[in-house]
């Protein structure tokens, strides 16, 4: 088997996870690796060693390999802070790329900028690259993109620009509530009940002001009525998504939404929207990420 040597390397480095792809000619994916060493667990001087552990076998000792990276790696607490583009703006601007200082002469690491919004205040890092990648594949798109995740983003796209966006901490809230509150004693770790999820979505959407009470009811139901742990977990997920969909109505009502995220999360959002009469379709997260970073790499080399 021939040894894999990358023409360039794409990296999506988030808060809790890092993914890297060895890219060959015509943007072909030669190899993929991932790590749970996210931004939140690393000091500034640890980013380069972590990256090298993942990609070293893809490097050619006779040349410099470009690494294009997006995500929280460019945050203030990351490898090196990158600037924010201000909405309305194109998702990616290579004039704002930041080069990280590296000790290994075989790599040159470029970090893409994030996007900020002044009123209401909001920020994104990583999602702008995925939005750019989606737009690259859908040049005439005008509409709404939703990126489910730890911090879900809803963005209005107009004429190739991010016009406005809104963030919901739904994923993080689910993690905290299911793992670090009293409710953890009533929920399963991985189980799922679709009917409970859908009922939770409807309740969360119709009565968002009752979310604090509905959350405690999960604990009470488990004690008083022996609520199944899988049902409790699924209801919790549905409640939180329902509250988010209530708050995001201005984005999805009357619009066809494109969901860009993991297959599991995107399917949950798709089902949640469907229950409420919304329309949506899924777009591959990996395709969006690689398309965005590939565009940045090409522009960098043509500049």
Each model region followed by its residue ranges:
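Adenine-nucleotide phosphate-binding core of ATP-dependent small-molecule kinases
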Residues: 204-247
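Short beta-strand-loop/turn "lid" adjacent to the catalytic site in phosphate-handling enzymes
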Residues: 58-124, 159
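Short glycine-rich, Thr/Ser-proximal phosphate-binding strand/loop in the N-terminal lobe
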Residues: 3, 8-46, 283
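Glycine-rich phosphate-binding loop plus the immediately following alpha-helix
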Residues: 40-43, 115-148, 153-207
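Short glycine-aspartate micro-motif
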Residues: 8-12, 66-68, 143-147, 258-259
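N-terminal phosphate-binding loop and adjacent alpha-helix
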Residues: 29-65, 74-77, 81, 183-187
